Structure formats: C-alpha cells, structure tokens
C-alpha cells in the first residue's frame, strides 16, 4: 500500500542543510500496525507528515496505492488525504468553537456530503467512540481523553485506509492514554493501517512492527532484522 | 462544500466567537458610520448655504446703487458721482411691463424701545411686496399695509425674537414701540425663520419705507428688489431696467443688477471648495476606515492559521479554504456596512430634529461608496492572508510556523 523509495526531506536552517529524512526506503502493507520511535529530531514526525501528504519530499518517491505522489499538485494531494488518510495529533487540533459532534462532522461537510447521509455516519462513529452524552459539548468542556477520542472520530469518519497518529498519548495521563491506544488498536483490528509516532517505549512495543529512527534514517525495523554478519557454521 | 454548510459554518463562527465578530462588525460599522456622518454634515452645510440663496426666487433681481466693475481692467480713477437710488426710480421701474412687484429697501441699526426695555435692532424700511419677495410669513397680525411709496404710516412688523425680548410673555400686537424719535404700532409678528442672506429676520423690525427714510434721515435706497412676471426675457428686462435708470440718471449707468444666477456663480468658488471639503472628509474617513478594517481582518485570519492547517489536513482544497474565509468576510462586511448606515441615518435624523434649518442628509454616493469600501477592504484583507495560509504547506500551517520561528 505504501512504498517509499529513497525519500529525502531537507531543511535549510541558517547556512546548514539538515536532512530530516535521509534516503528512506519503506514498504507498508495494508492493515499493518507500526510504531515509529526515536529521539527528538530523528525525523519521525517528518516521516509521518510525509506519509500523510502534509509535506512534500525534496527527493525520492512516495507511492500511495500505486499512485506516485511527488508529481501531484496540492489539490490532488488534498483529495488523496481526504479519501485515504486520517490524522490524530498530539494537541488534538479540534476547532474550539465547534461541538464534539460538529468536529467529527467537519470532514464530511468539507467533502460535500448531504446532511441526510451525514447523520447516520456520525451517529455510528459517536456510538462507536462512546461519546453520545458528550456530543453537544465543545472541546473546552471535555477531558483530554475525550478530546482525543473526538479527534479519532474525526480521523475515521471518512473511513480512511491509513490512520496516522503523532504522539496521540503525549498530552494524556496514563489511563486515558491506554484507552486511546486501545481504541486505535481496535480500529487496526478492523482493518485500518495504523502508524503511531511515539516517545513512549511502552506504547511503541505494542505495535506489531517497530521502526526506530536516528538522524533521518531508519535504524532498525523489526520486520526486517538487521543483517548482522554471522559466523559460518 | 455545500453552500448551506458553508453558511452554517460561517454563522457558527460568528455566533460562537462573539467578541471577535463584534470587534470586526464594530470596526466596519464605525467606519461606514463615520463616512456617512461626515459627508452628511458636510452636505447639510452645503445645502444650507445653497438654500439661503434659493430664498430669493429665480425671477427676483436685486438692484444696488453704484456700478460694480466686474470685467477687470483699470478701475476708474476719477471720483464717481454716485447718485442715490430714489423712491421715484423704484416707482418708474414698477411701471415697466414685465415687472410685477418692486420692494425698495432701506436698512440700518436703530435703538428700539418699549417702556423701559430697549434694544438695538436691525431696522428695515420697505413695503408690502417685500414680504412676498423675501418669503416672509406673518405669524400674528398682518403685514405692512399697501401704501404709495412716499406715504408713511406709524406701523411696524417685528421678528419673533425681538418680540420676546421687548414684550416677554405679554401680547405685543397693538402696542407702541419707540424707534429713534418716532413711534410705531406693532401690527404683525413674523413667523420664526432662520437667517437669510445675513439678516436675522427674527431680530428685525420692518416699517414703511417712507418712515425709514425719515428715521435714518436719508433719501437714497439701500437696494431695490424687483420681481419679474416671468423668467422669459430676464435678460431683456434687465436691459430695460438699466436703460431706464440710465435715462433717469442723466445718461450714466450707475446701478448694478444682481440676479440669483449671478449671485450663485459669484459664490460658485465657495460652493466648489465646500464640495471639495466634503469629498476630502469622505476620502480621509474612508482611508481610516479601510485601515481599521484591514487590521481587524488581518488579526482575525492570522489567528486562524492552525485552523487553516487542519482544514487542509482534512483534505480541504485551497480554493475551499479561501471560499470559507471570503464568504465569512463578506457576511461581516455587508452586515457591518448595513449597521453603520442605519446608525448614521438615525443620528442624522436626530440632528435634523435638533437643527431643523440644516438639511443633514448623506448623499447616496457616500452610502454606496462607504459600503463598497468597507466590503472591498474587508474582503481584500481577509483574502490576502487567507490565500497565503491556504497556499502554505499543510504541515507549516498546522504548526503555525510563522509564530513558531519568531
């Protein structure tokens, strides 16, 4: 489903060129559950933004469902995001003036879906996330865990194939953090491809496939054990 | 995005961010109001001045003694023998074919007293025709009687303010006033009316012209108002009057005739300056309004860069993002402009109530212009930052990179 070939992303900071992503090759199958770990500045968020088409590569190619994305314009990338990708951010990024229900509804509205068709979809998502009695509340009236559930609801309401979560538990206490990660894992069990960027070792190891990043490179990938020189038997 | 959803989204924004919306609405409304009020007051002043000139009918000529050279050139160095304009001259004019009425005028300040109260008042000597020509109405009693020019009568008509000052609450009709060494019986009181051509008729006393000649001990007339039967042949009538006076004054043309048109054209410079001043005031207030709206719009949009980032992450095309912000700005601008016009109309109506003589009205061009300028600036300065944010990489907008790097 996802194919990265020699993907690069560099930033000019002052007169220094920083390689946030340094020739990355990565292959992700549909339905996989990955965690990306690594120290700050190792490029894990840049990788997530790249996979989410929020950022454009400086070099290399990214294929999403066999579509080469590097040549696409912003409009086409927006359409791909809308139809295939859901985002969960550390700071939720909910619109403060909209209620929980309206925040979840937003992607459907932007996609131009008729109100009649929207209603059953949102109802299902709200029930699924156990937010029924909080649906009419604005984010400031919700707890952190509830806010992140609303954000997850918004991410999955368009039924994307890929769910990208950037430190989804970073602002949460351990109990709500675990609830959120369990919710994401349930969604993965239902078939969604899940990629979680995290600092938290305990969360990282729950993934079926763990990536470790250092200095813009994938230092280890549990699916492809490092080829260490082995002594001949 | 569907139109209904777009509207709902914007209305929610306006409804749930009341402070921000109120600020933007107030900025636009105040700007539009300022433009409308200022031009309304300026226009009111201009119309007031114009109205003053229109007090004289178009078919009324004013004759002054002496020749005013308006053609330039070297002024006559020899001393001019200015003959007086006499009542006989006025009588001769009254006999001309196209002349319907003639009002001779002598005017000056005179001490007027009643019992112990006394006051210096503007004293006018004229006749019955003067009332019609100057459009003076009598509130109580009657106007001066119809008399031959040379015949006096000890009666007077006084302005409402003079009446109040001399008689207070007591009735004035039939009472006697002293002016100089003559006495006059009050036979009429003028209706309250503002100033006209510099005379405050509310403070004036009008007596028959023959009496005024005696009072001021002066035979010469200050001026003569001539009312023509019709406007056709205005030029010819003017020529005939001048010819008549030349004949009567031993071949010398020593009077000047002023028409309303010539008076207006003489004041054209002043009126043009007034119009320019009004336009200048409008221009400056539009500029200030534009900058005010610009700032509030800029703040409103830059506060929402993260929201734009989110919309883009959710797959909203740049075009839709721009549409959301533009439609919101138009709703705000239009309702703000409407509110501003409404408030300014209300205030001007109040001002008209307080000062009925000055016609405070905002010209249509100012209303349209202010609404247009408000809408265009609000749209422009919502569009520029919204466009910029919409064209940012989604990741930069989400993190609001501008703020982050600062």
Where are the model-predicted features located?
Chain A
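H-loop (His-switch) and adjacent beta-strand-loop-beta switch element
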Residues: 210-223
